[in-house]
């Protein structure tokens, strides 16, 4: 044993526990990130569908041209 680095019996256990905890946190964070990305993509798709439906309704109501003319 080296005199400059004393052995700590519980040091390895503590280090392993800390590494395991960090690994678990990282895995949970990655899962959360994936879930959030999926939900944001789904929300974007729903917004696009809603916009198409609104455009269709406006065209059916005959107000599409009047709104475009008012904004130009």
From Swiss-Prot:
Q: Name one Pfam family in it.
A: HSBP1
The question of whether ATP-binding is a record keyword is answered with: no
A Gene Ontology annotation in the biological process aspect, one of them, is: cellular heat acclimation
- The lineage's top-level taxon is Eukaryota
Q: Does the keyword Phosphoprotein apply?
A: no
Q: Which family does it belong to?
A: Belongs to the HSBP1 family.
Identification of the protein by name: Heat shock factor-binding protein 1-like protein 1
Disulphide bridges in this chain?
none
Record keywords, A-Z: Coiled coil
